[in-house]
C-alpha cells in the first residue's frame, strides 16, 4: 500500500509539473490577444528583471502618433526593411541565416521586428536555438493578431535603448533631451542603429562608426516610400 500511495503521489506531482509547463507555453499566446487593447501597456522581460533586481527603469509609454515618423522610418530601414510585407518572419532571410550557420560562417541577426517584439515580451535575452524555436511561432502569432501599427507601437515602447532606458520616449529624453515627437532625422537614425547593442552603442555620444551607420540609415529612411505604407497609409 505505501508503494501504491507513493505512485499516486508521484503521478500527482508529475501532472502538476506538466500542467504548469503547458500554462507557461500557452500564456504568451493568450497575452497576445490581450495586447490588442490600445490602453494596455505591456512590459518586457528585461523590465521585469530590473524590477526583481530592484534596479528600476525609465519607460514612458507614448502612442504611435506621438512618435516622429522619421524614427519609425529609421527603425524599419535599420531593423526590418520587409516589415510591411512578411507575416512575422522573413523566411528568405532565415534561410540564408541557416545556410551561413551550416557553413560555419558569421551570421547576421535575422530577427524581424515581430520576432524581436516576441522575444522582448515573452522570452529571455541570450541567444540559443531553443529560444529561436520558441520565438518563431510567437512572432507569426503576434503579427497575425496585432495590426502592424499596434505591433510597431509596442515594439518602440519596450525596446531597450540603454541601461534601464526602455521605449522611445525615455530614449529621446535621455539621449537628446527632446520628446519622441520632436526627434530629427539624424537623431532618429542614431537611435535606430543603436538598437542591436544599446548597452555599447550610445546614440547620444556616437563614435565615428556609429555616425557612419546612422548616415546610411538616414539615406534609406528618406527613400523608404512603399516600405512603410502599412504604418502610414
Swiss-Prot record:
Localisation per UniProt entry: Cell inner membrane
PANTHER family in UniProt: BIOSYNTHETIC PEPTIDOGLYCAN TRANSGLYCOSYLASE (PTHR30400:SF0), MONOFUNCTIONAL BIOSYNTHETIC PEPTIDOGLYCAN TRANSGLYCOSYLASE (PTHR30400)
MF annotations from Gene Ontology: pentosyltransferase activity; peptidoglycan glycosyltransferase activity
Keywords from the UniProt entry: Cell inner membrane, Cell membrane, Cell shape, Cell wall biogenesis/degradation, Glycosyltransferase, Membrane, Peptidoglycan synthesis, Transferase, Transmembrane, Transmembrane helix
GO CC field: peptidoglycan-based cell wall; plasma membrane
Pfam families named among the record's database cross-references: Transgly
Name this polypeptide is given: Biosynthetic peptidoglycan transglycosylase
Catalytic activity line of the entry: [GlcNAc-(1->4)-Mur2Ac(oyl-L-Ala-gamma-D-Glu-L-Lys-D-Ala-D-Ala)](n)-di-trans,octa-cis-undecaprenyl diphosphate + beta-D-GlcNAc-(1->4)-Mur2Ac(oyl-L-Ala-gamma-D-Glu-L-Lys-D-Ala-D-Ala)-di-trans,octa-cis-undecaprenyl diphosphate = [GlcNAc-(1->4)-Mur2Ac(oyl-L-Ala-gamma-D-Glu-L-Lys-D-Ala-D-Ala)](n+1)-di-trans,octa-cis-undecaprenyl diphosphate + di-trans,octa-cis-undecaprenyl diphosphate + H(+)
Swiss-Prot/TrEMBL GO biological process terms: cell wall organization; peptidoglycan biosynthetic process; regulation of cell shape
HAMAP family the record matches: PGT_MtgA (MF_00766)
NCBIfam families: mono_pep_trsgly
TM regions (residue ranges): 17-37
EC number: 2.4.99.28
Keyword Membrane assigned: yes
Species this chain originates from: Rhizobium leguminosarum bv. trifolii (strain WSM2304)
Similarity comment: Belongs to the glycosyltransferase 51 family.
Role of this protein: Peptidoglycan polymerase that catalyzes glycan chain elongation from lipid-linked precursors.
Amino acid at each position: 500500500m505505501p508503494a501504491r500511495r507513493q505512485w499516486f503521489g508521484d503521478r500527482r506531482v508529475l501532472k502538476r509539473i506538466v500542467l504548469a509547463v503547458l500554462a507557461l507555453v500557452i500564456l504568451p499566446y493568450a497575452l497576445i490577444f490581450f495586447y490588442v487593447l490600445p490602453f494596455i501597456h505591456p512590459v518586457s522581460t528585461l523590465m521585469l528583471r530590473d524590477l526583481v533586481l530592484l534596479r528600476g527603469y525609465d519607460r514612458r509609454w507614448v502612442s504611435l502618433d506621438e512618435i516622429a515618423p522619421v524614427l519609425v522610418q529609421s527603425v524599419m530601414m535599420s531593423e526590418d526593411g520587409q516589415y510591411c510585407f512578411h507575416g512575422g518572419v522573413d523566411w528568405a532571410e532565415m534561410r540564408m541565416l541557416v545556410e551561413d550557420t551550416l557553413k560555419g560562417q558569421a551570421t547576421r541577426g535575422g530577427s524581424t521586428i515581430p520576432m524581436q517584439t516576441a522575444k522582448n515580451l515573452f522570452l529571455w535575452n541570450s541567444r540559443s536555438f531553443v529560444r529561436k524555436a520558441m520565438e518563431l511561432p510567437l512572432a507569426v502569432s503576434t503579427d497575425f493578431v496585432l495590426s502592424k501599427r499596434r505591433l510597431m507601437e509596442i515594439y518602440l515602447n519596450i525596446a531597450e535603448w540603454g541601461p534601464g532606458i526602455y521605449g522611445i520616449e525615455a530614449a529621446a529624453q535621455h539621449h537628446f533631451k527632446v520628446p519622441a515627437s520632436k526627434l530629427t532625422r539624424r537623431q532618429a537614425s542614431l537611435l535606430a542603429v543603436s538598437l542591436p547593442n544599446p548597452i555599447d552603442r550610445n546614440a547620444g555620444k556616437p563614435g565615428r562608426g556609429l555616425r557612419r551607420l546612422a548616415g546610411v540609415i538616414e539615406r534609406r529612411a528618406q527613400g523608404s516610400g512603399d516600405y512603410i505604407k502599412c504604418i502610414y497609409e
